[in-house]
C-alpha cells in the first residue's frame, strides 16, 4: 500500500513526534508498504523539497514559523498552516491520487483542512494518531471555555475528518 504520513516533525528534528513518525514509516517500509512523509518546514527557501531517508520519501513543504514564537503569532500561523501546505503540495511532483490512506499525527488540529483537501481530492481514508485530545487540552490550560466554538472544533475538525483514533495515553477519555 502507498501510505501518506503527515506530521509536524520528522528527523533530523529530535522531538518525540519526529522519532515516532520515523519509526512508523520505517515499520511500514519493512512490512512492504510504500510510505511517503509530508511535513511543514519553515527553514526551506523554495515551496518544497524532496529527499529520501532510509528508503522513505520525505516532502518538506514551505510553511510559516510555528515554533519558538509567541503564542498569538503561533496561533495565527497554525491557522494558516494548511493553506500554505496545500499551496506547496500542489507545486510538488507528488500524485495525491496514488495513495491508499493518509495517517496524520496530532496535536496539530490545524492539519484538518489539509486532510480534508487530500481526502476530497483522492477519495482515501484518514487515520489520526492522537497524542492529546483537542480541544480538551485547551480547557486544561484555560485557553478555551466549553461553548459553541469548543463543541464545533471537537466535533467537526477532529471526529468528522478522521476514521480511527489511536491514543498514546488515557488521560482524556473520549
Residues of each region from the PLM?
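A short, charged, and often flexible helix/loop element on the N-terminal side
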Residues: 57-87, 145-149
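An aromatic- and histidine-rich active-site surface loop
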Residues: 82-84, 99-124, 128-131, 136
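N-terminal subdomain of nucleotide-sugar transferases
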Residues: 1-57, 62
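A structural signal for isolated positions on well-ordered beta-strands in alpha/beta enzyme cores
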Residues: 4, 36-37, 127, 166-168
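Glycine-rich phosphate-binding loop signature in dinucleotide/nucleotide-binding domains
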Residues: 92-99
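Acceptor-binding helix/loop patch of EC 2.4 sugar-transfer enzymes
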Residues: 8, 66-73, 97, 122-155
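Membrane-proximal helix-turn-helix segments that form the acceptor-binding/catalytic region
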Residues: 113, 117-121, 148-167
Amino acid at each position: 500500500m502507498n501510505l501518506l504520513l503527515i506530521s509536524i516533525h520528522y528527523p533530523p528534528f529530535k522531538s518525540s513526534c519526529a522519532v515516532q513518525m520515523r519509526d512508523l514509516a520505517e515499520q511500514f517500509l519493512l512490512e512492504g508498504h510504500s510510505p511517503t512523509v509530508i511535513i511543514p518546514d519553515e527553514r526551506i527557501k523554495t515551496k518544497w523539497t524532496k529527499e529520501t531517508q532510509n528508503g522513505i520519501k520525505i516532502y518538506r513543504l514551505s510553511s510559516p514559523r510555528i515554533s519558538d514564537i509567541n503564542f498569538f503569532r503561533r496561533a495565527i500561523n497554525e491557522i494558516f498552516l494548511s493553506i500554505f501546505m496545500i499551496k506547496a503540495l500542489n507545486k510538488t511532483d507528488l500524485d495525491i491520487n496514488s495513495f491508499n490512506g493518509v495517517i496524520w499525527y496530532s496535536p496539530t488540529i490545524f492539519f484538518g483542512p489539509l486532510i480534508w483537501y487530500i481526502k476530497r481530492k483522492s477519495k482515501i481514508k484518514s487515520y489520526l494518531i492522537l497524542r492529546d485530545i483537542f480541544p480538551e487540552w485547551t480547557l486544561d490550560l484555560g485557553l478555551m471555555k466549553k461553548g459553541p466554538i469548543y463543541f464545533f472544533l471537537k466535533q467537526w475538525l477532529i471526529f468528522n475528518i478522521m476514521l480511527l483514533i489511536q491514543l498514546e495515553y488515557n488521560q482524556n477519555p473520549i
